[in-house]
């Protein structure tokens, strides 16, 4: 009887002979076949050779026959590897899938040439956005430089001339820029505060009159360490720089294929409802709108992804401002679960990357609190001003307006409706804007409230509540009073 070991050895020898005969037959058939092998076979063989080379450094199972065949065909394997690498390198680029794309590709996926033209056109538009934003940054830098010259307590005659020249250049550039915008974009012209020599001189006079080298002993903020009153001038100068730095493109909707300004109003109305549902801070709402506008200034978005942009912006803003922010599951639920959690997280990373991690836009609330010092923090005035301030996020004319100017205008019109008196020099000092600069803004804010239930329904319903002093109803009562007198 044959031993178990000898029988196993004979079976192994028989198996080796069969494998050797099969491999020789395959090699002979390949050499006798005319022409070159197909591309798919090259792919498969090259993948096998690549895998064998990678596993060579980390052997797990020793296959003697496979290694022998691999060494026999080492020269042909290297050629196959080069062919495979060339084909795959031209075929796809894995780096394009690192970030989720919120743009909607309106073209056929099979038409590669049309897709390339679409990408080239998108790159050109994005470069145009960058150039336009750089022009706006230079204009805002000129404004901030002029303000720094004015706010300096030790202004010399030479510095006055420098500020004067800067203002004249600013006026010329602003006029030419506005004319270009009207000629290119037609009707949509954003609102900006007016600047001229008379306004500059008035501001200089008020600042020199009310600026002090020592803290006011009668000011309660002097004794509150959390208010850091000794640093307030430097803090608000820096906030003015940030509001200019993070200004969105006021005409970004002209480059959006699927979106319109009316759609933005619908999205903001939904954001207001979600914001009120979670009882978040006012700063979170304004920061959300700024993220949306800045993101849309740099990327094209399809209508199917538009709500995702608003939800993700609210999610990021809540993380930045709130102590207890809503979870991603709650935000997804408020979006009717139209997007998965994974889509939310990918879109969040993508939006932060597009915003270049610049999330510290100041918003109007800090400026509104600063202005409230001029009337001893009158509660009714500030509450009504919050209503006027919040309706600005619905109007496309205020997309690129400075939040400090919007806060001053909301406070100004609130004092008029409540009969609190004129816009005093102290208000000019704390706001940085004169009455002449705020009158056009106040007219637009008041006009937007005439059809409040249509223009800003969610905000109107929100400010009907008692905790907001029924501010929206008060404004409607003011209109009825005006109509009855006329």
From Swiss-Prot:
Region (Disordered): 1-80, 105-126
Membrane-crossing segments per the record: none
InterPro entries, per the entry: Cyclin, Cyclin-like_dom, Cyclin-like_sf, Cyclin_A/B-like, Cyclin_C-dom, Cyclin_N, Cyclins_cyclin-box
GO terms for MF: cyclin-dependent protein serine/threonine kinase regulator activity
Signals that turn on the gene: Expressed from S phase through G2 and M phases and is degraded at the end of mitosis. Expression is down-regulated by the anti-fungal agent plagiochin E (PLE).
Keyword entries, A-Z: Cell cycle, Cell division, Coiled coil, Cyclin, Mitosis
Cell division as UniProt keyword: yes
Stored SUPFAM superfamilies: Cyclin-like
PROSITE patterns according to UniProt: CYCLINS (PS00292)
Biased composition (Acidic residues): 108-123
Coiled-coil region: 122-184
GO biological process: cell division; filamentous growth; G1/S transition of mitotic cell cycle; regulation of mitotic cell cycle
CDD domains: CYCLIN_CLBs_yeast_rpt2
Domain Cyclin N-terminal: 234-359
Bias (Polar residues) ranges: 25-41
GO CC term (a single one): cyclin-dependent protein kinase holoenzyme complex
Self-association state and partner proteins as the record states: Interacts with IQG1.
Family that this chain belongs to: Belongs to the cyclin family. Cyclin AB subfamily.
PANTHER family: CYCLINS
Function: 2/mitotic-specific cyclin essential for the control of the cell cycle at the G2/M (mitosis) transition. G2/M cyclins accumulate steadily during G2 and are abruptly destroyed at mitosis. Degradation is necessary for the cell to exit from mitosis. Plays a role in morphogenesis by negatively regulating polarized growth. Through binding to CDC28 regulates cytokinesis, partly by phosphorylation of the actomyosin ring component IQG1.
Name of this chain's protein: G2/mitotic-specific cyclin-4
């Amino acid at each position: 009887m044959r031993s178990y070991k000898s029988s196993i050895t004979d079976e192994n020898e028989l198996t080796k002979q069969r494998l050797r005969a099969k491999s020789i037959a395959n090699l002979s058939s390949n050499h006798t076949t005319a022409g070159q092998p197909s591309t798919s076979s090259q792919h498969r063989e090259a993948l096998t050779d690549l895998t064998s080379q990678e596993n060579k450094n980390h052997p797990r199972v020793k296959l003697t026959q496979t290694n022998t065949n691999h060494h026999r065909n080492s020269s042909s394997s290297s050629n196959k590897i080069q062919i495979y690498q060339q084909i795959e390198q031209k075929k796809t680029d894995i780096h394009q899938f690192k970030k989720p794309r919120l743009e909607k590709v309106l073209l056929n996926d099979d038409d590669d040439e049309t897709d390339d033209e679409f990408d080239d056109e998108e790159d050109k538009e994005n470069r145009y956005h960058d150039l336009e934003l750089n022009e706006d940054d230079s204009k805002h830098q000129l404004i901030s430089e002029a303000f720094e010259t004015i706010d300096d307590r030790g202004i010399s005659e030479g510095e006055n001339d420098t500020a004067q020249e800067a203002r004249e250049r600013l006026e010329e550039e602003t006029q030419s820029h506005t004319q270009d915008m009207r000629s290119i974009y037609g009707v949509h012209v954003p609102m900006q505060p007016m600047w001229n020599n008379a306004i500059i001189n008035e501001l200089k006079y008020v600042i020199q009159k009310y600026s002090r080298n020592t803290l006011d002993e009668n000011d309660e903020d002097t004794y509150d360490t959390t208010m850091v009153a000794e640093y307030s001038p430097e803090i608000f100068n820096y906030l003015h720089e940030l509001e200019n730095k993070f200004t969105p493109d006021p005409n970004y909707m002209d480059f959006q294929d699927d979106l319109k300004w009316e759609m933005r109003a619908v999205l903001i109305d939904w954001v207001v409802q979600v914001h009120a549902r979670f009882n978040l801070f006012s700063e979170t709402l304004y920061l959300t709108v700024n993220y949306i506008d800045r993101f849309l200034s740099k990327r094209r978005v399809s209508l199917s992804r538009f709500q995702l942009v608003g939800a993700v912006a609210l999610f990021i803003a809540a993380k930045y401002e709130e102590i207890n922010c809503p979870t991603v599951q709650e935000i997804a639920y408020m979006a009717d679960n139209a997007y998965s959690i994974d889509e939310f997280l990918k879109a969040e990373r993508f939006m932060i990357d597009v915003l270049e991690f610049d999330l510290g836009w100041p918003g109007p609330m800090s400026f509104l609190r600063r202005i409230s010092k001029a009337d001893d923090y009158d509660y009714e005035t500030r509450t009504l001003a919050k209503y006027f301030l919040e309706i600005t996020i619905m109007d496309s004319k205020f997309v690129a307006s400075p939040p400090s100017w919007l806060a001053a205008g909301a406070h100004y019109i609130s004092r008029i409706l409540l009969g609190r008196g004129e816009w005093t020099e102290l208000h000019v000092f704390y706001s940085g804007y004169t009455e002449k600069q705020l009158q056009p803004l106040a007219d637009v804010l008041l006009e937007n409230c005439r059809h409040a239930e249509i223009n800003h329904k969610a905000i109107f319903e929100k400010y009907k509540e008692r905790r907001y002093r029924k501010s929206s109803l008060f404004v409607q009562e003011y209109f009825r009073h005006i109509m009855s007198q006329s």
